[in-house]
Amino acid sequence: RSLVGSEMCIRDRVGAQKAGSITGCSSSATVKGTVDVGGVAGEKWGSMTACYATGNVTLEIDSPKNLSGGGLVGFNGGSSVLACYATGNVTSTGSSTGNVHIGGFLGDNYTTVTACYWKNNHEQGIGYNNKVTEATKVDGTDVTWQKAVDAMNTALQTAGSKWRYELNGALPTLRKL
């Protein structure tokens, strides 16, 4: 099943995406959870294109399990992430005897990430990374939001996507061609 800019996706977040694609999705929700927690999706196995999250994310640790938290996605397995960004702060509370991976963009990553950006309280964009990625921190000096928008739009155009970012305020927003 694919979510393409639907009301459900814009108002809420995806708990676990097992297949399909999420495209043209945004979330400003404050998200709290206990296992895999992210601004748009807690766990993602399908593709994600042209999505962003601006709300804060909190991983509430109270488990011996392996846990992950990220500004966009907590656990990123499966298919690709293309032209997405996250700006909400990512924090954690508690402790675990398992592995805990937290990143400003993704908690755990096992797939290709292209032309993606983050700007929040984390220097590290990906908590645990098992792939070559293009996830870059917007620092306002060398990497600005305008440079990020240009790179994300180039990647979207190359992929044949009808989505584009615009920078008319402090943060980029999406529009469909």
Where are these regions (language model features)?
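Predominantly extracellular beta-rich ligand-binding scaffolds that present long acidic/polar faces
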Residues: 6, 11-177
